[in-house]
Amino acid sequence: MSELSVVALGHVHTESIEPLTAHLTRLEQVMTNLAPRVSLVDVRAELNRAVDAAAHDWILILREREFVDAALAAEIAASMKTADAWGFRIRVAPLYAGKELRVGVDPGELRLFHRRHLLRRGEVGVQGTVVRLRNAIHARTFDSPEEHRAYLAMNAVPHSSLRRALLFLSRARTFDANTLRYLWIEAGYDQQ
């Protein structure tokens, strides 16, 4: 019997976890009042309460704008059944305009764990083995460059052309056109 509780940070849509339903007998979503981008260390008490309120032993932490695809759903279900470890690190792959961004290496975060092995203080961790899953959680950033520019125009201060070019050149470490477009737009603004 495969049962999973999803602890949601922010508003997580049902479509974000729908691929899990094909592999699980029961799926529960535990809503929290936590901000989507908050550090889990800073809200340990609230996270512990959410884990205690969950009905199932296996817990998945998902943030707003993140979603599980079919490959990750199958890997999560298989990992829960084999129980090779009590915790699983999962990378987050940001999507920009529908394509994956290549901005640095993400070692992953402990996002899937068995509640009885959760350490209740400090960094999020489990007592026992932690394994990194192959597939990643996907996170939507902006659906288009126009949406990205509009957001920055409202919430950030523009840079000069020279500063923008210098920032872009210092951060550009890829030849992926989608990632370069993202970095060029980001370099144009100073976010508060």
Protein language model features and the residues they cover:
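A short beta-strand-loop structural module common to alpha/beta enzyme folds
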Residues: 30-40
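Local beta-strand N-terminus motif with an aromatic residue
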Residues: 2-4, 56, 85
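Catalytic-site signature of metal-activated, phosphate-bearing donor transferases
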Residues: 48-51, 69-192
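N-proximal low-complexity "stem/linker" segments adjacent to membrane-targeting elements
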Residues: 1-32
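Short beta-strand-to-loop acidic/aromatic patch adjacent to the donor-nucleotide binding site
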Residues: 56-67
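Active-site nucleotide-sugar/metal-binding loop of Leloir-type enzymes
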Residues: 44-58
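A generic local structural motif
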Residues: 17-20, 45-48, 74
